[in-house]
């Protein structure tokens, strides 16, 4: 909720140069919990405002994308405010998000104890500084930090840049020693599945898909989807191949293949 409002504000202040859309980066979660706090899921349960079990932001985004674009990219010479100088567009965007997501509670009771979002976050013992974001690209020096240049990284969260082989060594070590990993990828990649497996099929070696253009997951036929959930030839990308895919737009926003460990 708060991240949506912050992103809308950034989009309007930059006249649309900052994108406003669904999604974001892992840094949004870290920034959000330290800045705004946390609440138990039952306080703002996904889908609770429209009797569903999971969040479905399609309709919400259709409304708010249009609202933010009308202000950020419109031809209005002056934006309206109320008697307290609060911008009316902000109040309107916040109201729509509250209708679809719920109103963030100022206080709530959890297991017999009263909390605010900030005090509940503090009670968890979580620290944003315990998490680190890693990436691997050659257009910045290795062993330095930089904000990955994708639209969803609009808060300019920093990532440590490692050579690809070291990047994977850290990944494997994190798993083997019990640390948590969040891997940034996207459901429109051909190797995405909802069965707990992600692969990068080798188009040339996967004979069962011979003649296919490896359409995005949502366009694959059921029999084609099954091919991504069983062992098959995979492509092991080199540093140069990874960089080229980023540079030529083959893998861009939402396809950052970034991970964070703690």
Predicted regions and their residues:
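Predominantly the structural core of cysteine protease catalytic domains
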Residues: 5-258
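Conserved small/polar residues in nucleotide/adenosyl-binding loops
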Residues: 261
